């Protein structure tokens, strides 16, 4: 959309998109919060707190009454339903931005299958993937190498646990 609006390619504009699992129903989220916290309102929310590492990810809620609640990912019925596509919007399954061929310069997202292909790169907080789609994206990546710890991976390896790339 931005590229079409600008109607020209700017050298200093890097277009980045994210690997998206989909968007859950806001109604399901509201019902979940009401079920969890009743009349207490959530004033702050962190969906993926990795402070204790990738194997102990929590959803962190701060409520208006000052209490803080940590819910482990594996124990969250909301997260399990989202991961299993129980309430991802139907339009997400028809999204024209899914797939490998993207109009961005780079795509970034979680590298869930890293352990299977590049176990030497594992760390306790998780690893992101960068998929390069353009010469500009390649140039940016090369200019950033001194700030990155990286390995070369095949797009197919990244796509295994990122179904929206398929």
Protein language model regions, located:
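A short alpha->loop->secondary-structure connector
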Residues: 5-18
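Short beta->alpha junction loops/turns
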Residues: 21-22, 133
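Oxidoreductase and adenylate-handling cofactor-binding alpha/beta cores
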Residues: 35-36
